């Protein structure tokens, strides 16, 4: 007779795999400018020291073709005369040479500790990002020419940062982002917008090459379940600006937002468990209702 067949031991069910929480990008808006003057090397150094892995800044070209960092197209809001007095008359970057810009102080308005701070060049910022091992979020401003966009891309390449750079610009500057992906189909690009609608999605899709990450970078008031679904159906992730409240940040990430441009929130601020969708949407809607049209409309 055949020996009895030993029954196979029962298969232990594998424990359920916990879904990984997405890593949220916290982007230092114009550097960490709660500690140092915005868009200056001290602000970027403060951001890196605080733990930010992503630094945002705005690029303009001078009259003699030097790429410099400043949010506005004029320097009046952030610069002062060398003696600390306010600048009289509008000073537009595109009508000034780099040497002329060096005559102004970009730190003294924030306090004596920053006396003598000069406007940074794009080249030195990219070099800093490389040395600090952080990712630059490069906002293209002032309707640059294709040649100017290519100049910036060349500077990024020379710094060995082509694979790290993120390029962002508003919908009305879509052509500039198209210039970026035409020159480098693998470039990561984000389309800035105050809203999130079908037209925004259609514009962003023109930047998809099949080889790159394209995302929507929208004002936080544009986020709700429907707009997030619209983006997801197009294969677009969503990042937001400018969020300085932890509760709002938690609500936005619970709705699927993967990046937050901020003035104050440190990268360590995350939520262990996402909120219920209806709770998250209610919080976002409350903040949107209270939102007032300020300079935060434009990062």
Language model: regions and residue ranges:
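Phosphate-group recognition and catalysis centered on beta-loop-alpha active-site segments
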Residues: 1-299
């Amino acid at each position: 007779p055949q020996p009895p067949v030993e029954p196979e031991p029962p298969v232990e069910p594998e424990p359920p795999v916990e879904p990984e929480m997405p890593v949220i990008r916290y982007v230092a808006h114009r550097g960490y400018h709660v500690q140092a003057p915005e868009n200056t090397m001290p602000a970027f150094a403060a951001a890196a020291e605080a733990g930010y892995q992503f630094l945002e800044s705005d690029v303009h070209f001078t009259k003699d073709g030097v790429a410099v960092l400043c949010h506005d197209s004029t320097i009046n809001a952030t610069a002062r005369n060398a003696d600390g007095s306010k600048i009289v008359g509008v000073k537009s970057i595109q009508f000034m040479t780099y040497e002329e810009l060096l005559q102004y102080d970009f730190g003294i308005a924030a306090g004596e500790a920053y006396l003598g701070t000069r406007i940074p060049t794009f080249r030195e910022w990219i070099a800093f990002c490389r040395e600090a091992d952080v990712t630059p979020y490069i906002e293209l401003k002032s309707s640059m020419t294709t040649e100017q966009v290519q100049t910036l891309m060349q500077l990024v390449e020379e710094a060995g940062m082509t694979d790290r750079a993120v390029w962002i610009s508003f919908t009305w500057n879509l052509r500039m982002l198209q210039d970026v992906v035409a020159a480098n189909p693998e470039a990561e690009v984000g389309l800035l917008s105050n809203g999130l609608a079908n037209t925004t999605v259609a514009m962003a899709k023109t930047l998809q090459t099949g080889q790159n990450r394209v995302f929507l970078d929208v004002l936080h008031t544009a986020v709700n379940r429907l707009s997030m679904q619209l983006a997801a159906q197009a294969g677009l992730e969503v990042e937001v600006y400018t969020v300085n409240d932890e509760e709002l940040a938690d609500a936005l990430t619970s709705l699927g937002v993967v990046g937050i441009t901020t003035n104050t929130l440190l990268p360590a601020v995350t939520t262990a468990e996402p909120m219920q969708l209806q709770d998250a949407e209610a919080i976002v809607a409350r903040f949107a209702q209270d939102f007032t049209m300020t300079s935060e409309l434009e990062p």
